[in-house]
């Protein structure tokens, strides 16, 4: 091949030079782990995972990444934040190329509506939307849930739509016998009008797009990860 494009995350690029030594390599570099001022020490309200085991695990992961950077002719990453997780020696070799957003579809749509239980929700409504694959602290679920009482106090006619599942994500598992979704929702459910809050679970693509199109506010929260 003239060009091989690959992801450096789990060692996929490590041995390709052994097979095709003359080929040009373009590496998609997603994230470089840091031991300070990073995801592992960001949120002391949930956990501060700076144990020796975690630090050594991240050093070991980075060692694989570094071996792949060494054989890369070019490196790309989607955002400036991701580029900034790398040391200067590597940052100077990385180009930021955004993955793109289809703004012909992902934009407000006055004709779109979403049926949720007995409600038909559209752009005329106040809609606060949170979307994450996993509803977990790593993606700010706990912070969002804690904000709902104030949101509904100021806007009692708002709809709160939450899309995402209970499966394991990037962070630690919840306490045994519960989910992150249940744990944090239980902390606020007696303080709010729960008829305004809808957990939609994992939805198909059409419903996801419609939710984006009718949202007044789309909330995205995350650890620095």
Regions found by a protein language model. Give the residues of each.
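Short acidic alpha-helix that forms the nucleotide-activated donor recognition element
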Residues: 67-70, 185, 204-215
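Acceptor-binding helix/loop patch of EC 2.4 sugar-transfer enzymes
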Residues: 23-63, 104, 108-109, 166-178
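Carbohydrate-associated surface elements
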Residues: 81, 100
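Nucleotide-activated donor-binding/catalytic signature segment of Leloir-type glycosyltransferases, i.e.
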Residues: 164, 168, 172-206
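Short N-terminal targeting/anchoring amphipathic segment
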Residues: 2-10, 24-26, 217-220
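Acidic anion/phosphate-binding donor-loop and adjacent secondary structure
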Residues: 88, 101-119, 210
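Acidic donor-binding loop of glycosyltransferase active sites
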Residues: 73, 210-225
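Conserved donor-binding/catalytic core segment of Leloir-type glycosyltransferases
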Residues: 117-139, 145-150, 160-161
